[in-house]
Amino acid sequence: GEDRIYRELRAAVPVVDAAILKLVRLCGGFQVRCRGEERLREFLRTVPCGRGQYGIDAFLSAYLDSLLTYGRAVGELVVAGERLRAVCWGDVTALEVREGANALDMELWGPDDRGQMHRLPWQELLLFTTLNPEPEHPYGVSMLRGMPFLADILLKIYNTIGVNWERAGNVRSS
């Protein structure tokens, strides 16, 4: 559906991909202040966050990238021995969001090994954020929502430039 279009749009139109990456970089980082500030800073700098990445900045960059691209982002707090051991981001396109016991509750569902959707365990350790939710899109709206139309025009322009470049100097095409 739309998620595939957004992913392909970023791959096909480099300026769109660069713009999202620039927005992520412009958001910058943050500072923490507390009694154990040095220990917390060290944790935030070294916390594993998945896919060979370390540090809360890497997690936040991937999380924000997903939020801008798909209108929603998902993450997981990994706890072991009653301590936070990692903060990982996930593929929000593989999940379903379903209404919980009431309209204010929601549950994240994901596929098992056979592709069947099941309620994910440990919901309290999952992070889920939406961008600009609307009544008809309660689980977020992509920043790229209006881009497929524009991308179609850009792809036609790029294609025409390519055809013209190939024809340059060709007497038959003159």
What does each of the following model-derived ranges do?
Residues 1-174:
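Structured, contiguous alpha/beta core segments that scaffold functional sites
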